[in-house]
Amino acid sequence: SFSSYLNLVRLGVPEDDISTILMADHGLMLYGNAVIVNTEFAKANPDMVKKFLIAVGAGWKDAIANPEAAAIALVKRNPAADAALEQRRLQLAIDANVLTDYVKANGMGGIDTARFASAIKQLSETYDYKTTPDAALYFTDAYLPSGGISLN
């Protein structure tokens, strides 16, 4: 949604003429980005997985504290990117998807089990499951610090 919004702005559409309709604002309970780790790798390298998640959290914390520096770092890796545009995209993501009330209260990385169960149920309205998914097969907090990753 942020890319579409910013593309319209770049094309000269006045921002007051653009409405962004977020599915989450209308009851869709899905989670977004996730770190996916091969279960065998995680079992064999639990400390590495834990340290990686802590590093991801530190990166987010730095990006939240200084979105301009984060955008500049991105442009160093992708010279075709526009730093001002990427900073704006990052800020939109931080405001709407990263620093949520849940994350502020519970840290980053964990899930609300009731929400996750609702998300699985909502997906079943579109997809026919051969077996009912077991949420425990798709998420573990075993590699997260107690209380999640604090972004405060």
Regions inferred by a protein language model and the residue ranges of each:
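Bilobed "Venus flytrap"/periplasmic-binding protein-like clamshell domains
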Residues: 1-10, 27-32, 117-118
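Short, catalytically relevant binding-site loops at active-site mouths
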Residues: 3-4, 25-28, 41-42, 59
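Ligand-binding "clamshell"
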Residues: 7-23, 84-88
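Short coil/loop linkers at secondary-structure junctions
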Residues: 14, 80, 129-130
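Short linear loop/turn motifs
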Residues: 21-23, 88-94, 134-146
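A bilobed periplasmic-binding-protein/Venus flytrap-type ligand-binding module shared by bacterial periplasmic
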Residues: 31-47
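Secondary-structure end/capping motifs
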Residues: 44-126
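Conserved C-terminal helix/tail region of periplasmic/extracytoplasmic solute-binding proteins
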Residues: 116-152
